[in-house]
């Protein structure tokens, strides 16, 4: 029951990387995970993705980081132990863990496959388990995890874990809202604002859906990679008013992947057809102006979205495997982590980082 607490047996020795305080200084952190229960899966972590959100959480940008903090909400590995009542997995299976490791299981959202919108979620990193008397969860940037089998994902056989692990963040973040709004149908024309970690994978999904992808970016230098490397059909700089006007009323949807609200809402709404939709998956730090007239006259919509439920997580991995979709990923060792965080801060990454945990992070007494 929500609100009840029971002291857990914490016996699994673990080591992760994270921060002791808001200075953001990264360091090894030793801790204990719970003893695997009858429905738990014990996982040897092999890869952990790193993204902008991790950098912000390490430095307590949003004001709710709990220290010591071990980050990691996109994790891939292999099963090394299963509880007596686990049915989905066996030792040796390749698996993944996304941003959630628990939820209440009783609310409307949980009952309808939207566990990510549970009002009492247990996030993979930094959440406080209801049953653990205030002990925070520790993320996947560690050598081992213990997770309820419900929140463990089956890893497709033909999907590489090193370049596939960012799908547990960047992939689900764009897949979920596009599917929900029907933009996964062939023939849809979708604009993608920004060509970073989210935008690049959005383009790949759109093309696999059978749609048309137009990238809108602040940087002309990204045109070649958008079209030649990711398969975009068209590319427009967001200051090219002539080309943008020519695209007015042609798009079924626009996915804004940028965090800074750099593209005016009026511009995005102007690109939409009647009944079109703007999907906000970035997190603007400032308020933007909302032009109401284009919404009313075109019956257009603006929606926000945050990751996806467990079913959608699995669908994302399976769809990516079916269409040979992986993320453009730079695989690094744990000793490079501080440099990687600085590069993320300076927008110097193309397009995601994944830490080779299995070969570079070991527990030592």
From Swiss-Prot:
UniProt cofactor note: Binds 2 Zn(2+) ions per subunit.
Binding, NADP(+): 52, 195, 197-198, 217-219, 222, 262, 281, 283, 305, 307, 352
Positions bound to Zn(2+) 2: 104, 107, 110, 118
Practical applications according to UniProt: The strictosidine aglycone-producing AJM7-DeltaHYS yeast strain expressing pathway genes of the VOM module, RsGS, SBE (GsSBE, RsSBE1 or RsSBE2), RsPNAE, RsVS and RsVH, accumulates vomilenine. Additionnal expression of pathway genes of the AJM module, RsVR, RsDHVR, AAE (RsAAE1 or RsAAE2) and RsNNMT, leads to the production of ajmaline. Ajmaline is an anti-arrhythmic alkaloid commercially used as an efficient drug for the treatment of arrhythmic heart disorder.
Keywords tagged on the record: Alkaloid metabolism, Metal-binding, NADP, Oxidoreductase, Zinc
Residues reported in the UniProt entry to bind Zn(2+) 1: 51, 73-74, 169
Keyword Metal-binding: yes
UniProt EC number: 1.3.1.36
Entry comment describing in which tissues the protein is expressed: Mainly expressed in roots and, to a lower level, in leaves.
The protein's role, per its UniProt record: Alcohol dehydrogenase involved in the biosynthesis of ajmaline-type monoterpenoid indole alkaloids (MIAs) natural products, important plant-derived pharmaceuticals used in the therapy of heart disorders. Catalyzes iminium reduction on 4,21-dehydrogeissoschizine to produce 19E-geissoschizine, precursor of vomilenine, an intermediate chemical in the biosynthesis of ajmaline.
UniProt similarity note: Belongs to the zinc-containing alcohol dehydrogenase family. Class-III subfamily.
Protein name: Geissoschizine synthase
